[in-house]
């Protein structure tokens, strides 16, 4: 049976050697690919100009905290009660807003946004506290957390153009089953994905699975664990069962529930779509890299008011803000 730790470590050492031996190597991440998919100008600001910004926001901050606490819970370094305590300590002392009311000058509007921020924070907090309070580790023969994997794109596409490109990423959780297959789980503190957003983010896990499959592992399942949600189980007298995804804060004390793990179909069709996602966006990167000295504000911008104002760290230096 394949040794999970040894094979992952060997893969990581190979990547280190590639970086040393090929100074032109471009190490791609899902974040880079999704950034250029969203906006080429944002990509240039971030990955070519390397403009320093405070890229943290309430979601990245609390997401990182949740990942850290889950790691410690799986390693039995903290108890459920301690995880709840640490979560509450951090969320109550953080400087980030769910809805930023601090820049609004109109008093009535500020009060409205302040109340909205309080509501979002309370709901989010109740969901996550219930997650940590009810945390139960999934049982595996072995597991790894927060491990880097990679694959050479010239081997994937069999094209010389990609010889200086590799895809890599850090997998939240890899679980080894008794039959030697593996599960890939990504923890999410966000709202559940739907539509195009679900399709886009599925590529991340599919690409991680391709990396691990290339190492010789058989993929059993891949999916997200949406931490704010639970899968409510309702059993009927006729033997039928109904499963409903609900926010954890809505659960009653006697409700039966399980983690809300949303699986992604890992099949040939979806693998092709994920690889096309890489192929198309690497071509965009190549074209932008060729004009790296060009004024970034002359690079095409995919303007979206909500995204630009709330999620893009470069809004204030981008000419769309003027």
PLM features: residue spans?
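RecB-family 4Fe-4S metal-dependent nuclease core
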Residues: 1-322
């Amino acid at each position: 049976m394949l040794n999970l730790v040894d094979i992952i470590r060997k893969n990581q050492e190979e990547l280190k050697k590639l970086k040393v031996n090929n100074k032109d190597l471009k190490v791609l991440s899902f974040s880079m690919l999704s950034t250029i998919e969203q906006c080429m100008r944002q990509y240039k600001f971030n990955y070519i100009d390397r403009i320093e910004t405070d890229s943290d926001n309430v979601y990245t901050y609390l997401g990182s905290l949740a990942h850290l606490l889950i790691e410690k819970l799986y390693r039995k370094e903290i108890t459920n009660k301690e995880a709840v305590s640490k979560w509450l300590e951090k969320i109550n002392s953080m400087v980030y807003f769910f809805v930023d009311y601090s820049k609004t000058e109109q008093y009535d509007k500020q009060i409205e946004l302040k109340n909205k921020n309080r509501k979002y924070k309370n709901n989010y907090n109740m969901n996550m506290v219930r997650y940590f309070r009810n945390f139960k580790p999934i049982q595996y023969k072995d597991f790894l957390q927060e491990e880097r994997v990679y694959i050479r794109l010239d081997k994937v596409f069999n094209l010389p153009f990609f010889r200086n490109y590799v895809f890599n990423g850090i997998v939240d959780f890899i679980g080894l089953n008794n039959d030697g297959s593996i599960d890939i789980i990504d923890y999410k503190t966000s709202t559940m994905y739907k539509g195009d957003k679900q399709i886009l983010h599925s590529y991340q896990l599919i690409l991680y699975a391709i990396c691990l499959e290339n190492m010789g592992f058989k993929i059993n399942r891949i999916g997200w664990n949406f931490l704010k949600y639970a899968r409510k189980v309702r059993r009927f007298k006729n033997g039928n069962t109904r499963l409903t995804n609900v926010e954890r804060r809505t659960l009653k004390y006697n409700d039966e529930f399980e983690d809300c793990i949303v699986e992604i179909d890992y099949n040939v069709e979806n693998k092709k779509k994920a690889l096309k996602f890489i192929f198309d966006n690497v071509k965009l990167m190549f074209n932008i890299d060729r004009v790296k000295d060009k004024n970034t504000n002359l690079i095409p911008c995919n303007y979206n008011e909500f995204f630009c104002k709330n999620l893009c760290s470069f809004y204030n230096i981008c000419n769309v803000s003027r």
